[in-house]
Amino acid sequence: MLEQPPLSLYIHIPWCIKKCPYCDFNSHQVNGSFEEDKYTNKLYDDFLVELNRLGDKNRELQSIFIGGGTPSLFKGDSFHFLFTRIKSHLKFSGNIEITIEANPGAVDSEKFRAYFDAGINRISLGVQSFDDKYLSKLGRIHTSDDAIKSIEVAKSAGFENINLDIMHGLPEQSIEAAVEDLRIAIEQSPSHISWYQFTIEPNTYFYNYPPKLPSENIQDGIFEKGTKILSTHAFSQYEVSAFAQNSRKSFHNHNYWSFGDYLGIGSGAHGKLTLLNENKLIRTNKPKRPDHYMNHAVDSATQLREI
């Protein structure tokens, strides 16, 4: 017999300033402008379609995650528009977690304040490294100084729940360099660190032109020393790459790992729903290309799969 799990919402923003050579996410480099208003309206249409699939409209949203791409390219008004309308259909839980991913190379203090004012209460900054040498190897558009500034701007905007994405095992990275990245990250007093091992994925530039990676022994040494440092500074590991202070675990990610339900809206977004009245699970998958997503009826373009 199926049980009703917690409900989350994933919103995908597909555009980015520059496609990184290691990125295998559904992201599309901006060439000139992009249709933010049209896309935002389509997200709401998409939400209404998913709402009809939901069945029980009395379920509360426990978390929202805005990923990409680079969601911080969008205005705060766009998210205020969405949240206001979504709230008219689904109740937000009293302690809802609303996360936005942001690129340190696309930081705007007014925009960050607008995100906070719109109800976003958690920000995830894609720092990846505090060493300009490695940032250059990764094709990132920001510098170490930009990364530190983005953290300061987020705090000034009102964010207390801040996640830093940091990679380790970068091309030709030493144990000392990886540990130094963590040390600087911890100095910034984030509430959460996502410490990922760098991997080369198919359909990326690095897959066709692979850089030289650290040996297995070095990578093992990085992980051993890194996890020890994080533990020393009261970061509790609750998933292989996730470390939180003061019970600031990401509810949204935990809901994924716990086989919870999530509505997925936006180009390339995936969703999973438990339909108790039909005793079945369904998965949804939206068109990856933004133009195809915006120019077709959402319901007819959505792929459905029962599991």
Q: At which residue positions do the language-model features occur?
A:
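C-terminal scaffold of the Radical SAM
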Residues: 4-6, 27-53, 59-307
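Local cysteine-cluster metal-coordination motifs and their immediate loop/turn environment
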Residues: 14-27
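Short active-site neighborhood of thiol/selenol oxidoreductases, capturing the structured segment around
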Residues: 9-13
